[in-house]
């Protein structure tokens, strides 16, 4: 009886750990914005066709959902998608200008804080071209998440950029309800530009 009780607790308490890796999707970048219909979340998946050599032209690596609040967006995603959304590998958070405004940013911070799998070392950027940024492809067909992660981490110590992490965002928001200055990204032709301001 004791063994059976332990088994039940283990299975019910494991949560997403019970979902096999092949039944998950792992967004590297999450975009958040505001539209006339409510809040927008964009999930950018890594391009597995490039990594495996298998072409899947019909698959869009960008999932976009728009609803009145973030919890509703996630609930709809979970009801409509065959794979579990695992945010534990998220590297980049990209915010449009509207969601940085008072009122919207409070809802965003509340949502992010209750997402226990999103790490505080995620880099945060802002843009007024959220759609263009998420559909941008690098020279080697890298996704936006892979590219920005590379800018931040795959450099020598003298070349590394000083990004802003989600931890810093939480800290300033807790202090005075505002957000720190965020590096800006935009698309110029085939290039993705990043402005780190005085932190470059």
Language model regions located:
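Membrane-proximal alpha-helical signals and transmembrane carboxylates
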Residues: 2-200
